[in-house]
Amino acid sequence: MIRYPNGKSYQPKTAASSLQKKPSYSNRGMTLEDDLNETNMYYQSHSIAVIHKKPTPVQIVQVDYPKRSAAVIKEAYFKQSSTTDYNGVYKGRYIDFEAKETKSRTSFPLQNFHDHQIEHMKQVVAQDGICFVIISAFEEIYFLEAEKLFYFWERKKQNGRKSIRKDELQEAAHPISLGYSPRIDYIKIIDQLYFSPS
């Protein structure tokens, strides 16, 4: 019989127990996020724009101090992000955006946003910043200007739809084709909307 160093015997996992494992939804948005991070690295390395992902704030609960110079965090939790996912600068203009993903085939749920995020976006727009959402939905990627998101958000708050229908999103947003380098070239749309001659 095989035993661990602590004396307990080895118990192999059975096929039945591995089949009962519940699916994990913890990294649903990682593909979109990874593609955006690669895109932003491309923009920065080619001196196009400087856009960074904001770190998720962490609430530290318990710290051990075995030595004065060696503090060890024993317990910490991710806090709710207070603003948007990404910010930076492009052609002298402040850029601020959120990245969202849904598996729904019919609509984009507005519950993906929080009041404080919408309020932050409104403040950015009021200061003439470029603010938008990159949405991965219906096997497509969309660029939705913050001002258009505000319409859907206000409709929801007036006891209206709690989501953006597929046809509404396709009409209000700008599609972004996936590329190789950069992967999600959202700067093209920013150029069309904010920097092309009228």
Curated annotation (Swiss-Prot):
A cellular component term, taken from the record's GO annotations: cytoplasm
Site (Transition state stabilizer): K100
UniProt entry tagged with the keyword Membrane: no
An individual GO BP term: DNA repair
Keyword field: Cytoplasm, DNA damage, DNA recombination, DNA repair, Endonuclease, Hydrolase, Magnesium, Metal-binding, Nuclease
Co-factor binding details: Binds 1 Mg(2+) ion per subunit.
Biased composition (Polar residues): 8-29
Subcellular location: Cytoplasm
Class of the enzyme per the UniProt entry, highest EC level: hydrolase
This enzyme's EC code(s): 3.1.21.10
Catalytically driven reaction(s): Endonucleolytic cleavage at a junction such as a reciprocal single-stranded crossover between two homologous DNA duplexes (Holliday junction)
Co-factor(s): Mg(2+)
UniProt superkingdom: Bacteria
Binding-site positions, Mg(2+): T83, D85, E98, Q117
Region feature Disordered, mapped onto this chain: 1-29
GO molecular function: endonuclease activity; magnesium ion binding; nucleic acid binding
HAMAP family attached to this UniProt entry: RecU
Cross-referenced NCBIfam families: PRK02234.1-2 (NF002581), PRK02234.1-5 (NF002584), recU (TIGR00648)
Role of this protein: Endonuclease that resolves Holliday junction intermediates in genetic recombination. Cleaves mobile four-strand junctions by introducing symmetrical nicks in paired strands. Promotes annealing of linear ssDNA with homologous dsDNA. Required for DNA repair, homologous recombination and chromosome segregation.
Similarity field: Belongs to the RecU family.
Name of the protein in its database record: Holliday junction resolvase RecU
Species per Swiss-Prot/TrEMBL record: Bacillus licheniformis (strain ATCC 14580 / DSM 13 / JCM 2505 / CCUG 7422 / NBRC 12200 / NCIMB 9375 / NCTC 10341 / NRRL NRS-1264 / Gibson 46)
